[in-house]
């Protein structure tokens, strides 16, 4: 049976806006499935995963790929791989590639994202960082951004951790969450993922699902 393989292009501006100010749009899997079935019946031209990753712009693009396996649901047999060199992530369901998406991991200094095999230990729709964020006043307006919780707060202000939606903790303080994607490793160790892709991961993975960083 043939499936339509979808590619969604996410612009830099949209990623920055969605990761910080708006809630990601929910994915309607039934609608997605119907669209894929209809496209298959119409014999539309599909792009295979192999051709997607063979593209010369694969390493630098913000495109992501979705396959027919995305309609399946089996958290016990689902896992995600984070590819540090290529700054890409891949979701597997029942041993089949379901989605490939861009990520931004930790910088290659004291904030690197450690390699290894881990398990998701916590999931939260909305999570606030306990380390990084902004100082805000009594009205909640930002006084100073991009600060560490240990920094001295200006008079009358307090620390407010950065919002990290679709949070999935897998290695101590490190987790996967929505965030700005610049196609380079630039986080404090976490794995930043575009909102739409991250919401899908949140739905398809569970506590105990495997995360492989390599």
What are these regions (language model features)?
Residues 5-12:
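Sec-dependent signal peptide hydrophobic core
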């Amino acid at each position: 049976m043939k499936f339509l393989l979808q590619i969604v292009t996410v612009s830099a501006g949209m990623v920055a806006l969605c990761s910080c100010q708006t809630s990601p749009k929910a994915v309607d899997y039934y609608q997605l499935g119907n669209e894929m079935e209809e496209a298959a019946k119409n014999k539309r031209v599909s792009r295979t995963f192999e051709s997607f990753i063979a593209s010369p712009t694969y390493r630098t693009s913000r495109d992501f790929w979705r396959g027919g396996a995305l309609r399946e649901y089996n958290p016990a047999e689902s896992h995600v791989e984070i590819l540090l060199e290529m700054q890409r992530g891949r979701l597997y369901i029942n041993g089949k590639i379901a989605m490939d998406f861009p990520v931004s991991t930790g910088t290659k200094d004291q904030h690197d994202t450690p390699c290894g095999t881990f398990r998701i230990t916590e999931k939260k729709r909305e999570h606030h960082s306990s380390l990084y964020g902004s100082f805000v006043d009594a009205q909640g307006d930002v006084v100073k951004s991009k600060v560490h919780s240990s920094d001295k707060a200006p008079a009358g202000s307090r620390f407010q951790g950065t919002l990290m939606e679709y949070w999935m903790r897998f290695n101590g303080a490190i987790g996967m969450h929505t965030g700005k994607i610049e196609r380079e490793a630039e986080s404090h160790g976490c794995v930043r993922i575009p909102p739409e892709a991250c919401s899908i991961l949140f739905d398809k993975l569970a506590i105990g699902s495997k995360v492989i960083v390599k």
